[in-house]
Curated annotation (Swiss-Prot):
Location of the protein in the cell: Mitochondrion outer membrane
Name recorded for this polypeptide: Mitochondrial import protein 1
Keyword hit for Cell membrane: no
Lineage of the species this protein comes from: Eukaryota, Fungi, Dikarya, Ascomycota, Taphrinomycotina
GO BP annotation list: protein insertion into mitochondrial outer membrane
Disulfide bridge partners, by residue number: none
Traits of the deletion mutant: Abnormal localization of atg43 to the outer mitochondrial membrane. Severely decreases vegetative cell population growth.
Subunit field text: Component of the mitochondrial outer import machinery (MIM) complex containing at least mim1 and mim2. Interacts with mim2. Interacts with mitophagy receptor atg43.
InterPro entries (alphabetical): OMP_MIM1/TOM13_mt
Record keywords: Membrane, Mitochondrion, Mitochondrion outer membrane, Protein transport, Transmembrane, Transmembrane helix, Transport
Length: 71
């Protein structure tokens, strides 16, 4: 018993659809992932700040200024 298989050539339209599908997965999902990570970081910072676990501002000390104050 032989099985008859018929191969249908891919049309240009189906190839274009596949290219867009793979591009959306490989380019769109990493972008969406980055956006969600950014929003999560903003939310976490706001949440921690509202609990009072972190100072309201960041202090940056310069070595030159520190040496200038000591002199």
């Amino acid at each position: 018993m032989e099985k008859n298989t018929v191969t249908v050539p891919k049309t240009l339209f189906s190839q274009v659809i596949h290219i867009f599908k793979y591009a959306a997965i490989n380019l769109g999902l990493p972008f969406l992932n980055g956006v969600m990570l950014g929003f999560g970081e903003i939310f976490a910072h706001a949440f921690i700040h509202s609990l009072g676990w972190a100072p309201g501002h960041t202090r940056i000390y310069s070595i030159q200024r520190h040496q200038y104050i000591q002199a």
